[in-house]
C-alpha cells in the first residue's frame, strides 16, 4: 500500500514526464511516514524497477519507469471499475482496411470540424481509420443499444449540403477516438470509421489486415 501511494505522489509531482528532484525527508510529507520508511519505500520501488533513481548532493532525481507506469494504469483501472462499473463496456474486434479516401475531405469541412472539437473534446486528425468488424463483433454492435450517441448536425456551405452523423466514444488499442456513422441508412453495419486526435495508423503502426481491439466507452458514468 505504501509503495503504490508513493508512486502515485511521484506521478503527481511530474515523475511520469521527467525526473523530479526530491529528498527522502521531503518525501515524508507525501507518504505520512518517517524519513527512514520513506527512504526504504523509494529503495524498494527502485529495486523492483518501478522507478529510476540518481543520487545527487541535494537529494535524488527520480523518474517513473514503464513498469511503474503500468502499475499506476492498473490501479486506475481498479478505481474506474469501483466507481464506474464495467457493465457497459463492449469489446469489438475487426481488421484494418483501406477506405475510399473521403474521410480527410469531410473532416476538413469547418461545419464538421468545429462540432467535433466542441462535442468530442478534441480536434481530429484529418483522416479516418477504417475497420471491418468480425461477424461476431458486428452482431454484438447491432444488438447494443447506444446510450451516449453524440449527434453532429448537417449543414450547407453555400454550394452543397452535408448530411448529419452520429458519434460515440471508443478506444482503439488504448488510444482514444470516436466512431463516426453517417445518418444515411444504407451504411454497412460492420464498417467503422474512427476519428482520433492522432494519426491512428501511424501511432499504432497498423497495416491493412491487422486486427485491432475496439472498446466502446460509456463516458457518462465517469464524467
Swiss-Prot record:
Residues the record lists as binding FMN: 185, 193
InterPro entries associated with the record: RibK_CTP-dep, Riboflavin_kinase_archaeal, Riboflavin_kinase_CTP-dep, Riboflavin_kinase_dom_sf, WH-like_DNA-bd_sf, WH_DNA-bd_sf
Associated pathway: Cofactor biosynthesis; FMN biosynthesis; FMN from riboflavin (CTP route): step 1/1
Source organism phylogeny: Archaea, Methanobacteriati, Methanobacteriota, Stenosarchaea group, Methanomicrobia
Organism: Methanococcoides burtonii (strain DSM 6242 / NBRC 107633 / OCM 468 / ACE-M)
Keywords for the protein's UniProt record, in alphabetical order: Flavoprotein, FMN, Kinase, Magnesium, Metal-binding, Nucleotide-binding, Transferase
Catalyses which reaction(s): riboflavin + CTP = CDP + FMN + H(+)
Designated name of the protein: Riboflavin kinase
Pfam families tied to this protein: CTP-dep_RFKase
Molecular function GO terms recorded: magnesium ion binding; nucleotide binding; riboflavin kinase activity
GO process annotations (BP): FMN biosynthetic process; riboflavin biosynthetic process
Cofactor: Mg(2+)
Region listing for Riboflavin kinase, in residue ranges: 90-223
EC number, UniProt record: 2.7.1.161
Amino acid at each position: 500500500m505504501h509503495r503504490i501511494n508513493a508512486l502515485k505522489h511521484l506521478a503527481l509531482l511530474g515523475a511520469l514526464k521527467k525526473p523530479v528532484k526530491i529528498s527522502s525527508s521531503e518525501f515524508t510529507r507525501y507518504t505520512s511516514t518517517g524519513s527512514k520508511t520513506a527512504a526504504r519505500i523509494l529503495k524498494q520501488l527502485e529495486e523492483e524497477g518501478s522507478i529510476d533513481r540518481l543520487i545527487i548532493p541535494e537529494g535524488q532525481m527520480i523518474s517513473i519507469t514503464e513498469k511503474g507506469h503500468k502499475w499506476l494504469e492498473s490501479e486506475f483501472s481498479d478505481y474506474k471499475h469501483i466507481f464506474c462499473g464495467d457493465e457497459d463496456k463492449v469489446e469489438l474486434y475487426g481488421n484494418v482496411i483501406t477506405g475510399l479516401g473521403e474521410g480527410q475531405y469531410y473532416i476538413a469541412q469547418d461545419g464538421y470540424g468545429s462540432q467535433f472539437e466542441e462535442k468530442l473534446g478534441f480536434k481530429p486528425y484529418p483522416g479516418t481509420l477504417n475497420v471491418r468488424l468480425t461477424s461476431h463483433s458486428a452482431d454484438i454492435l447491432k444488438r447494443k443499444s447506444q446510450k451516449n450517441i453524440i449527434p453532429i448536425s448537417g449543414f450547407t456551405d453555400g454550394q452543397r449540403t452535408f448530411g448529419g452523423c452520429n458519434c460515440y466514444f471508443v478506444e482503439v488499442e488504448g488510444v482514444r477516438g470516436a466512431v463516426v456513422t453517417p445518418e444515411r441508412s444504407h451504411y454497412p453495419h460492420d464498417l467503422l470509421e474512427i476519428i482520433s486526435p492522432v494519426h491512428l495508423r501511424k501511432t499504432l503502426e497498423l497495416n491493412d489486415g491487422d486486427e485491432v481491439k475496439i472498446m466502446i466507452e460509456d463516458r457518462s458514468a465517469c464524467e
